């Protein structure tokens, strides 16, 4: 049992750092086990005379320390496990330190570490302190110059900014020097050294400047980086057109690494990417991989302005860069891949991750007020809900005023570390609007619930809407205030005609009433169009109204939403023991009509075919029964497969593409619908369907179709599963990114023996627990996306996850902490399951030498 109590960091305690670090000169003498790092800091006092200089530093061996060239005696400084302190520092001086570190033993993958025989870094949020002594906080901006010395077997020596010198050294070594003219915080520092292939291109900015583009990858992988490089050029062009942002250095580099805790990192001029989000070709990457690469390349590039040029004053302001940048990358994806389809995908992800977060013990505001480890706040709330707040701001202000606010923010705060308050102030000033109430979205946790009741007066031709809002208590916030919620509303007639186009109603109080005149007939309400606010909506709509929306709504998000709501209600009523056989048949008929709508794109139809997920359905209950939900959902899947079998088989054939592979949205949409039909048909595995599915998998000529065929085979179990998995592994056993997919498909296996198989897979020769991609592919997929088997009545699934968390925590606390979340929802499940989940959380918290990362999340989950 732990006896120490880690100290929380509180927003209220923020104080500016009392010194400026005007320039930082770093010299790296790279060696896998004994790297020497020399740091020369130009320091100037900006705070009180009596304040000491306190620098962060962890796992560093101090070799030397000097001020203005004079070595310090032992009594002139102090060093402990987390910091270096100089009690009596001069007002202006040059501090020189030399430390020794061991990159090869760094399995936490924070700071400087080895991956695939190369050196690389990850410094956000607090990794730089494991490289050298420094004020490792985002409000200390410094101009960096870097010299890297290494053996010739590491031919590429890369860092931030522009290259300024390179050459040979004695003993087969060489060097490179880099200079970054833009002040940056330590979390944006980056270094890569290794044997890499490079793919080169250029981009001409809107002012006519030529920027060299370089993507560095493992030898032999350059062709797989072509799509990422093309995505980068599209992102650079889009940001110029949409936000007026131009790139500022002469060189932009991206490096792919296999071992990486995050998806990617926006280091100034030297982005480092998880290889799973950079490398793609039709044979090894799915359409989803292509989508993610396009979005993440854009996200990290967009950070050059929303994160790098303007950064966060402190880590409580993390949403300032992440929420805004997610909003921006979603905008690019909408323009590239279709606004409605992209919006549906974004909202599905928001509900699956962020709504669940808001509904549980880990709920926190978009701008938190305290933390133990900031690593734990890289959450869906910060990112996705943060983006939704920006989207609402644009809806409330209108596009022109929103753009004025963005321009003012970029102009006013360029080169600063700033706050959410300063951000919102720019939009208030640019629009002339009072946005003080809007700030509540940043301070208040929880998902608001909005109710709309309608009353139609036929004689007067008037519709009255009564809107109410409320937010349930969340940890530390028992009382909630009304928030300004933009509700996009339109009206349809019973035959699907448009009666009233979309209008924004701003619900900014607990209850309000809106009256609309000149409504000639009883309307069907289409509310929260485009998912205009991150809320749970309840209306007095009848099933017949929802079928009108499902068949005719001009807002495609709400058309999809109506279908999801109808399916959800049918699944929930069956799970509760009151099946609606007539309703299930009516739903299947309506779905069939939607699937033959020639005006609808295949990508949209694929989304219509996907039933609500079991985790999303569980959020509808106070004491969910995963087994009952799984059985009820499977029943509806089977009803659809039987009722629409001929149509599904016809669409499956029609959507086949025989020509050359294209990654564009139209071709991806056809593949998505074809694979959705295959998965739907697997719910009715008679001989004709089985033969079709075997043919789908066997004839697949790209990874999208191969994975689309593999999962139905796995779901069937028995001989089809074993043969398909064996053949896939044999074909792709030397491709790490494809093997991740092989593990992930088995993590989703719905068969009763799935848990036993997943546990066995952790002993498979290809399972790499120290690689976050492989760990997430199997363990995280099982715990998050296979609820029927994770929630095994014996509790064995929970024990397995707890075992993995404790194993991984010993060497990679950040990745271990991200595995805690599936146990955190224990209150939402029936007591016999919830008690077993809670017991595993208690076991985790009681474990000796537990990291702060895991302790914080597990303790909060227990409440």
UniProtKB/Swiss-Prot annotation:
CDD domains: M1_APN (cd09600). Zn(2+) binds at residues 299, 303, 322. It comes from the Bacteria. Belongs to the peptidase M1 family. It is an enzyme of class 3 (hydrolase). Signal peptide: none annotated. It comes from Caulobacter vibrioides (strain ATCC 19089 / CIP 103742 / CB 15) (Caulobacter crescentus). The active site is at residue 300. One of its GO terms (biological process) is proteolysis. Its cofactor is Zn(2+). Its EC number is 3.4.11.2. Binds 1 zinc ion per subunit. The gene is pepN. This is Aminopeptidase N. The record marks 383 as: Transition state stabilizer. GO terms for molecular function: alanyl aminopeptidase activity; metallopeptidase activity; zinc ion binding. SUPFAM superfamilies: Leukotriene A4 hydrolase N-terminal domain (SSF63737), Metalloproteases ('zincins'), catalytic domain (SSF55486). Substrate binds at residues 124, 263-267. It catalyses: Release of an N-terminal amino acid, Xaa-|-Yaa- from a peptide, amide or arylamide. Xaa is preferably Ala, but may be most amino acids including Pro (slow action). When a terminal hydrophobic residue is followed by a prolyl residue, the two may be released as an intact Xaa-Pro dipeptide. Aminopeptidase N is involved in the degradation of intracellular peptides generated by protein breakdown during normal growth as well as in response to nutrient starvation.
């Amino acid at each position: 049992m732990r006896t120490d109590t880690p100290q929380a960091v509180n927003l209220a305690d923020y104080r500016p750092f009392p010194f400026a670090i005007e320039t930082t000169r770093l010299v790296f003498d790279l060696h896998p086990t004994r790297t020497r790092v020399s740091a020369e800091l130009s320091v100037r006092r900006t705070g009180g005379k009596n304040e000491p200089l306190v620098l962060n530093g962890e796992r560093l061996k101090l070799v030397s320390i000097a001020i203005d060239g004079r070595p310090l005696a032992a009594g002139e400084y102090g060093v402990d496990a987390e910091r270096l302190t100089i009690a009596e520092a001069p007002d202006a001086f040059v501090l020189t330190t030399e430390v020794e570190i061991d990159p090869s033993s760094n399995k936490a993958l924070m700071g400087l570490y080895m991956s695939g025989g190369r050196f690389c870094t990850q410094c956000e949020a607090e990794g730089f302190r494991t490289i050298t002594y420094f004020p490792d906080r985002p409000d200390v901006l410094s101009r960096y110059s870097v010299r890297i010395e290494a053996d010739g077997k590491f031919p590429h020596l890369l860092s931030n900014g522009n290259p300024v010198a390179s050459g040979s050294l004695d003993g087969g070594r060489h060097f490179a020097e880099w200079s970054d003219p833009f002040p940056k915080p330590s979390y944006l520092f980056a270094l890569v050294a290794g044997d890499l292939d490079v793919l080169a291109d250029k981009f001409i900015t809107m002012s006519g400047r030529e920027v060299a583009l370089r993507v560095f990858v493992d030898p032999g992988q350059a062709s797989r980086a072509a799509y990422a490089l093309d995505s980068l050029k599209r992102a650079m062009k889009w940001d110029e057109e949409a936000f007026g942002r131009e790139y500022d250095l002469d060189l932009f580099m991206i490096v792919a690494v296999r071992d990486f805790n995050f998806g990617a990192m926006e280091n100034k001029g030297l982005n480092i990417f998880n290889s799973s989000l950079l490398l793609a070709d039709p044979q090894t990457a799915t359409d989803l991989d292509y989508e993610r690469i396009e979005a993440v390349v854009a996200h990290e590039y967009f950070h050059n302005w929303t994160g790098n040029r303007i950064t966060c004053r402190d880590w409580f302001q993390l949403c300032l860069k992440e929420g805004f940048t997610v909003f921006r990358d979603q905008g690019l994806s909408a323009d590239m891949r279709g606004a409605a389809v992209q919006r549906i995908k974004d909202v599905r992800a928001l509900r699956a991750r962020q709504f669940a977060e808001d509904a549980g013990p880990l709920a926190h505001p978009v701008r938190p007020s305290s933390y133990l480890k900031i690593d734990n706040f890289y959450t869906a709330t910060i990112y996705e809900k943060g983006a939704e707040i920006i989207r609402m701001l644009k809806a409330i202000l209108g596009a022109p005023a929103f753009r004025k606010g963005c321009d003012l923010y970029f102009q006013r705060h360029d080169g600063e570390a700033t706050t959410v308050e300063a951000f919102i102030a720019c939009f208030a000033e640019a629009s002339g609007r009072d946005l003080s109430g809007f700030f509540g979205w940043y301070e208040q946790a929880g998902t608001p619930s909005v109710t709309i009741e309608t009353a139609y007066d036929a004689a007067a031709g008037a519709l009255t809407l009564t809107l109410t809002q409320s937010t349930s208590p969340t940890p530390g916030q028992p009382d909630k205030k009304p928030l300004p919620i933009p509700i996009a509303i339109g009206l349809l007639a019973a035959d699907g005609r448009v009666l009233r186009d979309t209008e924004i109603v701003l619900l900014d109080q607990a209850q309000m009433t809106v009256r609309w005149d000149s409504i000639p007939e009883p309307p069907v309400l289409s509310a929260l169009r485009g998912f205009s606010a991150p809320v749970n909506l309840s209306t007095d709509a009848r099933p017949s109204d929802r079928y009108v929306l499902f068949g005719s709504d001009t807002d495609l998000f709400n058309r999809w939403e109506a279908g999801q709501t109808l399916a959800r209600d049918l699944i929930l009523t069956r799970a509760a023991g009151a099946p609606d056989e007539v309703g299930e048949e009516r739903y299947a008929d309506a779905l069939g009509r939607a699937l033959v709508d020639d005006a609808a794109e295949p990508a949209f139809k694929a989304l219509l075919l996907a039933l609500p997920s079991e985790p999303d359905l569980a959020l509808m209950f106070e004491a969910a029964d995963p087994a009952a939900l799984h059985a009820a959902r499977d029943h509806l899947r089977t009803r659809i497969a039987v009722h629409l079998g001929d149509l599904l088989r016809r669409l499956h054939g029609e959507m086949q593409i025989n020509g050359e592979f294209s990654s564009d949205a139209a071709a991806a949409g056809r593949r998505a619908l074809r694979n959705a039909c295959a998965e739907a048909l697997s719910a009715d595995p008679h001989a004709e369907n089985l033969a079709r599915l075997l043919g789908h998998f066997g004839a697949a000529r790209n990874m999208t179709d191969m994975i689309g065929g593999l999962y139905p085979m796995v779901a069937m179990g028995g001989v089809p599963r074993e043969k398909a998995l064996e053949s896939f592994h044999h074909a792709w056993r030397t491709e790490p990114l494809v093997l991740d997919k092989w593990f992930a498909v088995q993590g989703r296996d719905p068969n009763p023996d799935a848990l036993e198989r997943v546990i066995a897979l952790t002993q498979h020769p290809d399972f790499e627990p120290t690689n976050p991609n492989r760990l997430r592919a199997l363990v995280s997929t099982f715990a998050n996306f296979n609820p029927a088997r994770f929630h095994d009545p014996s509790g064995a699934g929970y024990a397995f996850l707890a075992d993995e968390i404790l194993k991984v925590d010993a060497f990679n606390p950040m990745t271990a902490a991200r595995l805690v979340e599936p146990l955190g929802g224990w209150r939402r499940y029936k007591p016999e399951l919830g008690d077993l989940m809670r017991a595993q959380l208690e076991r985790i918290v009681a474990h000796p030498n537990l990291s702060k990362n895991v302790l914080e999340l597990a303790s909060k989950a227990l409440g």
